[in-house]
């Protein structure tokens, strides 16, 4: 083992000799990961962690509310799964293997989105969550009443546009 002596110190710090030899081997492996796939991809096939980019002619949404009922879906019909509860990496891998998108459910109190700073922060959090979980976008599911021409009305319009722009910029092919 090589030793490093710090100037003005009598302490010796052992340095492993094999580490420099591993770095050139690891770099090509990291570079070989498909776009959108990272080393922490939960799928057996890392390519399944890439965002789905195809655009179907029509959409068939499934709103997943948990458990493992997704194992019994007719995957030949489904284009998008919206997760209403806890993230399930097994579901994400399976859906991507079947060519279906998996998206977040986006819900936020309408009174809060009037504040542009809050709105931007909420959108950034959703994008980060979607990217961390290898998801393909977001389904805004806001079911609160909004009066026509109210501040909430215009804020909701801004939320939809800003969310769409952010997701499309950050996740290729996202919804």
From Swiss-Prot:
The protein's name: Di-N-acetylchitobiase
GO MF terms, alphabetically ordered: chitinase activity
Subcellular location: Lysosome
Family statement: Belongs to the glycosyl hydrolase 18 family.
Major place of residence: other
Keywords annotated in UniProt: Glycoprotein, Glycosidase, Hydrolase, Lysosome, Signal
KW ATP-binding (keyword) present: no
Role: Involved in the degradation of asparagine-linked glycoproteins. Hydrolyze of N-acetyl-beta-D-glucosamine (1-4)N-acetylglucosamine chitobiose core from the reducing end of the bond, it requires prior cleavage by glycosylasparaginase.
């Amino acid at each position: 083992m090589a030793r490093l002596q710090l100037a003005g110190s009598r302490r010796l710090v052992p340095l492993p000799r094999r580490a420099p030899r591993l770095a050139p081997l690891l770099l090509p492996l990291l570079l070989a990961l498909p776009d959108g796939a990272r080393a922490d991809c939960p799928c057996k096939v890392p390519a399944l962690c890439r965002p789905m980019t195809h655009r179907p002619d029509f959409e068939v949404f499934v709103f997943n509310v948990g458990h493992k009922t997704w194992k019994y879906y007719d995957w030949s019909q489904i284009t998008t799964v919206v997760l209403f509860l806890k993230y399930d990496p097994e579901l994400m891998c399976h859906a991507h293997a079947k060519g279906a998108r998996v998206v977040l459910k986006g819900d936020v109190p309408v009174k809060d989105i009037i504040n542009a700073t809050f709105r931007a922060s909420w959108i950034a959090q959703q994008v980060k969550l979607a990217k961390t979980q290898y998801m393909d976008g977001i389904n805004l599911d806001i079911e609160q009443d909004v009066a026509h021409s109210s501040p909430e009305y215009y804020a909701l319009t801004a939320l939809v546009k800003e969310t769409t722009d952010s997701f499309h910029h950050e996740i290729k092919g996202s919804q």
